[in-house]
Amino acid sequence: MAVEGGMKCVKFLLYVLLLAFCACAVGLIAIGVAVQVVLKQAITHETTAGSLLPVVIIAVGAFLFLVAFVGCCGACKENYCLMITFAIFLSLIMLVEVAVAIAGYVFRDQVKSEFNKSFQQQMQNYLKDNKTATILDKLQKENNCCGASNYTDWENIPGMAKDRVPDSCCINITVGCGNDFKESTIHTQGCVETIAIWLRKNILLVAAAALGIAFVEVLGIIFSCCLVKSIRSGYEVM
């Protein structure tokens, strides 16, 4: 039995919210992938709580997209079971998002500590492993930084001359530009702080997006419950 009257308006608004859920899901996946790429470059393959956060963000985004699809099918067919499933899953997603937000706040300092520890370890292998050298050079080029804390970290690397830094530290990169360098010709800020700043900006972005998504999800739960009640009333009449 088709819904009537005010429920048609609720059903239409639910469709709009479902489209918003899809957009939010894509946004979460994109942010999670971006953070994961940075972590992959700067942190070793050791699994830690901090390094798992972007994976959880991606998983929540993918699950939200799936739930939005279930809700769309339920609203379109006015299926009682699908709408109940949609409301329950949407509530679970909200709980996970709260948990992720809390974990992100709790482990914010641990992520930076992991950066520093991993970067220092990889710097020790810069002259021994070409793959490591390529990763660090790319990281320094893309983030306009040099070393872990600052450019002087390279002085403690075995085999590295005291007056030399990798060419990737140079502002204008040319072959051999890191030899006999001047502070004015290289990036002096360390990569750990540079990347930490990038992560803080994006974590704030995620937090702001999460608040917006949570508000939309609450509306989604309310509208879906209204639609479920209307569908159930229709069945009872039949």
Swiss-Prot record:
CDD domains: CD63_LEL. It is a multi-pass membrane protein. Palmitoylated at a low, basal level in unstimulated platelets. The level of palmitoylation increases when platelets are activated by thrombin (in vitro). One of its GO terms (biological process) is positive regulation of receptor internalization. Changing residue 235 to A: Abolishes localization to lysosomes. GO terms for molecular function: protein-containing complex binding. Residues 33-51, 103-203 are extracellular. InterPro entries: CD63_LEL (IPR042028), Tetraspanin/Peripherin (IPR018499), Tetraspanin_animals (IPR000301), Tetraspanin_CS (IPR018503), Tetraspanin_EC2_sf (IPR008952). GO terms for cellular component: cell surface; endosome lumen; endosome membrane; extracellular exosome; late endosome; late endosome membrane; lysosomal membrane; lysosome. Interacts with TIMP1 and ITGB1 and recruits TIMP1 to ITGB1. Interacts with CD9. Identified in a complex with CD9 and ITGB3. Interacts with PMEL. Interacts with KDR/VEGFR2; identified in a complex with ITGB1 and KDR/VEGFR2 and is required to recruit KDR to ITGB1 complexes. Interacts with SYT7. Belongs to the tetraspanin (TM4SF) family. PANTHER family: CD63 ANTIGEN (PTHR19282:SF471), TETRASPANIN (PTHR19282). Functions as a cell surface receptor for TIMP1 and plays a role in the activation of cellular signaling cascades. Plays a role in the activation of ITGB1 and integrin signaling, leading to the activation of AKT, FAK/PTK2 and MAP kinases. Promotes cell survival, reorganization of the actin cytoskeleton, cell adhesion, spreading and migration, via its role in the activation of AKT and FAK/PTK2. Plays a role in VEGFA signaling via its role in regulating the internalization of KDR/VEGFR2. This is CD63 antigen. It comes from Mus musculus (Mouse).
